[in-house]
Amino acid sequence: MPNDTTLFLGQFLRTPATIGAVAPSSRQLAAAVCAPIPERGEPTVVELGPGTGPFTAEIQQRLGGRGHHLAVEVNEPMARLLAARFPAVDVVHADAARLGELLAERGLWQADVVVSGLPWAAFPQRLQHSLLDAVTSAMSPGAAFTTFSYIHAIPLSSARRFRALLAERFEEVVPGRTVWRNTPPAFVFHARRPRT
């Protein structure tokens, strides 16, 4: 079994538009991205693009057996690895655009938190729109959405377009501090209250 970095790099070389990174995210980035997960209650937490599971581990630690954790991964080898590694997580090999349908199949109508590891800056405009439509329509009115961007992507037109789209789709968008202990360094976007 290859280690996570080897698997990640191999899948990146195979499908760079859906992986978007050459290595798994660090624990520091995972902690920053997963900050909105509530400490109490039975939240429905959706994770998009979990890859090899650095955010998954953080989400599981924060949930401590509460709620429902749905992880949606489009890459089949990574979905298999994730399901084997985290048996308590509801891992599904599917496209994130099917989020509403995936929640409904489980009797879950809305997500309280959506954590995204998707490579938004690598996506064309139409895909950014359709995926964010799926996300916002699946969220409860007070829900939180977090995602991240690598600092080298800041000047890209696709990254600027995505930031504008976040501001259009959410009442509140707050950029977090740069997480330097990640390869490459990244910063987090915290968005709340989807406009549907």
What is the predicted role of each segment?
Residues M139-S149:
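Conserved beta-strand signature within the Rossmann-like core of class I S-adenosyl-L-methionine
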Residues D4-R40:
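Class I SAM-dependent methyltransferase Rossmann-like catalytic core
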Residues S157-T196:
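Class I S-adenosyl-L-methionine
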Residues E42-G51:
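Conserved class I S-adenosyl-L-methionine
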Residues H129-P141:
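A short glycine-rich, Lys/Arg-flanked "PGG" loop and its adjoining helix->strand segment in the class I
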Residues M78-L108:
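S-adenosyl-L-methionine
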Residues H68-E73:
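Conserved SAM-binding motif I beta-strand of class I
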